Amino acid sequence: MGAFMTHCGWNSVLECVAAGLPMVSCPHFTEQFMNEKLVVDVLWVGVPVGVKGAAQWGVDAEGVLATRQDVERAVAAVMDYGEEGSARRARAAKLGRKAREAVVHGGSSFRNVALLIQHVQQRASTRNPWIEKKPSDCR
């Protein structure tokens, strides 16, 4: 697969990063526009379709949805094998390697999940006075 077209939901962005794929971004609403900024302007691994505003369900607002030409332009840009396209793919591949390294045994995400589990287990083993009280004692 050469690239992935995404609405820029957080899980899709993480999956693309982990797979080392460049993205064509087409956000619809909420945090997806912020995620698009991360993908396109910070990580430099995506090409925007050019959506200007949030979609309203049931309303086909002119200028909000991407046109065929917008999608075609973005796909052509992300699949370009010139200098910019090659650099984008190299950055995506590098991020993918870093993401995979983070989740292997001993990686940063592996360690952080282990620490979270340890913290939850420690908190669960300590006695919480609020849990021991009856509802009538809490007034």
Where are these regions (language model features)?
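Catalytic core of nucleotide-sugar-dependent glycosyltransferases
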Residues: M1-R139
